[in-house]
Amino acid sequence: MVKAVAVLSSSEGVSGTIFFTQAADGPTTVTGEISGLKPGHHGFHVHALGDTTNGCMSTGPHFNPAGKEHGAPEDDIRHAGDLGNVNVGDDGKVSFSIIDSQIPLTGPNSIVGRAVVVHADPDDLGKGGHELSKTTGNAGGRVACGVIGLQG
């Protein structure tokens, strides 16, 4: 069992901890709790870089080793890092669990050392018709992020 964690930081009062676990070559389970967000859906992605020298802006684009267009987590055509949305309650908090087979913790496409990012707006899952739909899901600004690191 491989385990990883990302502690979210934000200049906007958002905080949270995201846990990643993977058994052998199976899918990765992502669980977490985030607080300080406005209610509603927020895009949730793994970005290519673990660079937070310029806050969340330096984490690069969505992790996309196959060079595909943006999509929903269940789509065949999607970035590996496209994890859809988290649905935040009226209290500004969300707890979630996601199982995904495109974000391994080991091997050449490992997400360890990359960043997880929470966006200001809903991810349209590549289906919104906006010019940014096929690249970012038109999910808006980056409100919180954290580097994914191995856990003991």
UniProtKB/Swiss-Prot annotation:
Swiss-Prot/TrEMBL catalytic activity:
2 superoxide + 2 H(+) = H2O2 + O2
Q: How is the cofactor bound?
A: Binds 1 copper ion per subunit.
Which cofactors is this protein said to need?
Cu cation; Zn(2+)
As one GO molecular function, the record gives: superoxide dismutase activity
GO CC: one term? cytoplasm
Q: What is its main location?
A: cytoplasm
What Pfam family is a match for this entry? Sod_Cu
- Residues that, per the record, bind Cu cation: 45, 47, 62, 119
Top EC group: oxidoreductase
Any idea where this protein resides?
Cytoplasm
In terms of InterPro entries, this protein maps to: SOD-like_Cu/Zn_dom_sf, SOD_Cu/Zn_/chaperone, SOD_Cu/Zn_BS, SOD_Cu_Zn_dom
Question: What functional role does this protein have?
Answer: Destroys radicals which are normally produced within the cells and which are toxic to biological systems.
Q: Which family does it belong to?
A: Belongs to the Cu-Zn superoxide dismutase family.
Q: How does it assemble?
A: Homodimer.
Q: What PANTHER family does the annotation carry? A: SUPEROXIDE DISMUTASE CU-ZN -RELATED (PTHR10003)
Protein's name in the database: Superoxide dismutase [Cu-Zn]
